[in-house]
């Protein structure tokens, strides 16, 4: 093998992957794990895997550390922004934690984000459960005649959304008038 051509090939590959990473960051604002998976998939698809996985992994790690050093990637900031966005959508804290874990965020950043949410809002799970009931038209948003018939179904929907039994029971026990007053406060 010719070391000079290998060096040129290595530099071309690094430049191509760095360009792909920058364009992806510009478009999507991903976490470190997401950009790593994206670059690996692009390498396998575009360059047909001409190098060993260890070499490619090193190249991708170098690119990611360089991007992180230049403040293009920041998992703490990513975790905070995603957690707030999920909370606005009506996710429970459990579902937020699970979603951030699936995005590849480490436990320390997840804990910090959840603590910030708890400090900013009093009982964020209750507020999110109210939003979920409004969005899915369950619990207090159902007609009074159907509420008892659909009680178990509504409990199941809230449980699958990540809310605890106490919060679900409290929400489903609210009257429609009380619920609407609470919605105005949100």
Residue ranges and their predicted role:
Residues 1-186:
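An alpha-helical, amphipathic repeat domain used for nucleic-acid recognition
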């Amino acid at each position: 093998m010719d070391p000079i051509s290998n060096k040129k090939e290595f530099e071309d590959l690094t430049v191509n992957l760095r360009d792909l990473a920058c364009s992806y960051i510009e478009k999507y604002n991903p976490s470190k794990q997401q950009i790593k998976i994206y670059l690996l998939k692009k390498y396998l698809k575009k360059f047909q895997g001409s190098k060993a996985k260890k070499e490619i992994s090193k190249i991708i790690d170098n690119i990611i550390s360089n991007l992180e050093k230049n403040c293009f990637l920041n998992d703490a900031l990513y975790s905070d922004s995603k957690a707030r966005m999920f909370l606005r959508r009506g996710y429970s804290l459990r579902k937020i934690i699970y979603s951030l874990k699936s995005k590849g965020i480490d436990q320390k950043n997840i804990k910090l984000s959840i603590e910030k949410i708890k400090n900013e809002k009093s009982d964020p799970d209750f507020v999110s459960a109210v939003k979920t009931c409004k969005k899915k038209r369950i619990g207090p948003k159902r007609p009074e005649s159907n509420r008892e018939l659909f009680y178990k179904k509504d409990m199941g929907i809230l449980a699958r959304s990540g809310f605890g039994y106490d919060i679900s029971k409290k929400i489903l026990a609210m009257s429609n008038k009380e619920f609407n007053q609470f919605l105005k406060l949100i």
